[in-house]
Amino acid sequence: MPSMPEEPLLTPTPDRFCMFPIHYPQIWEMYKKAEASFWTAEEVDLSQDNRDWENSLNDGERHFIKHVLAFFAASDGIVLENLASRFMSDVQVSEARAFYGFQIAIENIHSEMYSLLLDTYIKDNKERDHLFRAIETIPCVAKKAQWAMKWIDGSQTFAERIIAFACVEGIFFSGSFCSIFWLKKRGLMPGLTFSNELISRDEGLHCDFACLLYTLLKTKLSEERVKSIVCDAVEIEREFVCDALPCALVGMNRDLMSQYIEFVADRLLGALGYGKVYGVTNPFDWMELISLQGKTNFFEKRVGDYQKASVMSSVNGNGAFDNHVFSLDEDF
């Protein structure tokens, strides 16, 4: 039986203890993007949200938001556990570990933000505890969480696990992000919708990073295996946001939401280097203004003016990485 080729990304080397020299400029550039876009929960103003929560939303909308936030609050903890217990020790390249270090920090901030939103909106202690324990108490959340957690154990290859967590961050969040942006179109819940902009941008970057690492692997999965993982995630997300927690509660069309999830999945497959499964167009043209892809308008139209000044100069300026400039001249 032929031996498997060595994976440079996963092979222990003393170089991992020192940041320079950079071996993967694309990974380094992703790290600098993550560094440039750091934010904190204190930057999000929730003062208007309480008024909207009490006076502008109906019971169905409140139910939807509560359960979406409950899923988000739990899922970030699962992503964190995978990063801390698996990916940080799997990957042996210092610039990739640097990215994961920032991802761990920002996932903690996402978790804090979602918990703060629930704490702000839900006054009843018993209901709030029920939502914070959604993995145990809410079946539709538990199903998504169980799918994500099964990829943390040691039985699958790194390639399979990185595809699965690209699905968690690229597909499992897509319907919920889209629904919250729908509320933004209506001018409701500015704190929730602003934090959603920040978090969806971050998750897009994390998904892009997973795709980049996958493309750098020497041994990739069969197209059939990748599509099996992606389509499984699509069905679970579709069930969650179309049936178990129907997007109709916030006035969105079920069939169009299902199509949107398929569109997101096809885009992910393309980023991984595979063909489309669904071949559908984006039914929500207004989502193109937001886009879950981390690269989209990242520096031109950053939301909330929170990109840290000068951080990208080492990549975009006259430094060591001139050949890897992130151009602002292209049309995204």
Curated annotation (Swiss-Prot):
It comes from the Eukaryota. GO terms for cellular component: cytoplasm; nucleus. Expressed in roots, cauline and rosette leaves, stems and flowers. Its EC number is 1.17.4.1. The keyword Cytoplasm applies. Its cofactor is Fe cation. 'TSO' means 'ugly' in Chinese. This is Ribonucleoside-diphosphate reductase small chain C.
